[in-house]
A protein has these predicted regions:
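Class I S-adenosyl-L-methionine
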Residues: 1-141
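C-terminal target-recognition/interaction regions appended to catalytic cores
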Residues: 96-234
Length: 234
């Protein structure tokens, strides 16, 4: 979570620092955004690194080239509501360096299954234009959601907002496909989180959504791990 550094006037951070300092660890902390490390998503999280033999410097992390939604998912099969399978073949060629990275070592495509949306949800989605959301709906169809971002479509040329555990629900936020009348699939969400295609998610739909939505993006974790390794070798 991002606000652990500042919430309750820094109480929780101070508790962590005191306890780890007592064990001989030096602490470094910073808020990192996954978009700076090759992840097609605006995702800010607080990271705390404790080390006993060195002081870690977050400036050692190396930023990566920006990746957008088109780079991330345009090669995945265009599914309608309730289409797809747990395991399938790739139907389209690789269209970006990011897709090549995601497909590496994966002979099959997994978890590319679209939610079975209700007819009411499908009718709403049909009213929503590219790059827009709830503002396209008549006020009587807005529902109880207060946030402006609900029923939003992802933009091919931009990064995604933060993926959460309810990305399978169009009314939850900006997590509908840029063109198709459905929310993103678990595999599309996993791509946006930077999980490679050979990482397979098991369990029911709720469990899979939690596994993906609560995760630290692997490419961000990789950048942090490389920076820690640099510190160890100094």
């Amino acid at each position: 979570m991002k606000n652990i550094i500042s919430c309750t006037k820094g109480y929780f951070l101070e508790e962590i620092k005191e306890r780890l300092n007592a064990l001989g660890y030096q602490l470094s902390y910073q808020i990192l955004n996954a978009k700076d490390y090759g992840v097609p998503q605006n995702r800010e999280r607080a990271f705390i690194v404790g080390a006993s033999r060195f002081s870690f410097d977050f400036n050692l992390l190396e930023p990566s080239q920006s990746v957008n939604i088109q780079d991330a998912i345009s090669d995945l099969a265009y599914l309608c509501s309730n289409e797809g399978a747990f395991e399938s073949d790739y139907l389209n060629p690789i269209q970006s360096n990011y897709q090549a990275l995601m497909r590496k070592d994966s002979p099959k495509l997994y978890n590319h299954q679209a939610t079975n949306h209700s007819q009411a949800a499908l009718e709403k989605l049909k009213l929503i234009n590219k790059e827009q959301g709830k503002e396209c709906l008549p006020k009587n169809l807005h529902g109880k959601q207060q946030f402006k971002s609900t029923w939003g479509r992802l933009n091919w040329n931009k990064i995604s907002p933060t993926i959460d555990t309810r990305f399978d629900t169009p009314s939850n936020g900006t997590n509908s496909h840029p063109e198709l009348h459905r929310s993103i699939t678990p595999r599309e969400a996993a791509r946006i989180q930077s999980f490679s295609d050979n990482y397979i998610f098991y369990g029911n739909k709720t469990s899979v959504c939690k596994q993906i939505g609560n995760a630290v993006p692997p490419l961000l974790a990789l950048a942090l791990g490389k920076a820690i390794l640099k510190s160890l070798r100094k």
